[in-house]
Amino acid sequence: MGEAEKIGTRKPRARDLCIPFDGTPGKYNAITDVGGVEVGFSTIIQGDSVRTGVTSIFPRGTDLTIYQPPCFANWFSLNGNGEMTGIHWLTESGFLTSPILITSTNNVGICRDSMIKWFLIKSDSNSMINMVDVGLPIAAETWDGYLNDAYGFHVKEEHVFEALENAKVSGPFVQEGNVGGGTGMRSFDFKAGTGTSSRIVEDLNYTVGVLVQANFGSKKLLTIAGVPVGKELLQIETNNTVQNKGAGSIIVILATDAPLLPHQLKRVATRISLGIGRLGGTGDDPSGDIFLAFSTANISRV
């Protein structure tokens, strides 16, 4: 798998193109650099009109034969024109007790319900222990209606199961772009989708990793490493009609192995907004910009 990560056998990432981002990434520059985190996908591409899917994130891995303690967690909404189920109890309890699913807007319900059914199918004594509050799972969304037949309800139970099962075999290298829930997404008038990165906390043995499903932003505001790329592109394009006026959404899931409590994770989730702003996001009124942060460090049996 290490050889497959080399340029030529995978799509180049921003750092491969010498874009000078700050900080030191982890080994895989992905949310999976936080120990135990696993990610899976189900990608649905059919004909000319179906471009959608499901992304799964397991905070403590996919081995349900052992007890998995909940993770301390919290969340923040920069702009709330979106959906993330299960967050009322997460807020009150401070616990994340299920995997996280990300999909398209009209498929939140099937994802939420199918996750519960998936756990019931695997309902031996240990996985039932891991079902503490999994009846209120986390399922989030962004709208893929520009590239996908969003009202065709193409995500089915088997696709949710596939995303959950795929996390067992996908390994630490996380696919990006046109994959999983990100399949039909676009940002800043470019094709977008699923993205991930990580950073090592300076002078401390901690890692912060994120996974995003990006579907937001206007091209004229796109900023990369401090450079107003969007404005430059609009000046040189012959057809600079801007399709996206800023509507859209972004879901950000942040994982860390730093020992943080729920009120501290609230502060971390809130500060994701600053990163969105540096990229050119403005939290427009039609946008659903919702962020969840969790820590894998603290072990607590409830």
Question: Model regions: which residues?
Answer:
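Alpha/propeptide regions of enzymes that mature by internal proteolysis
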Residues: M1-V302
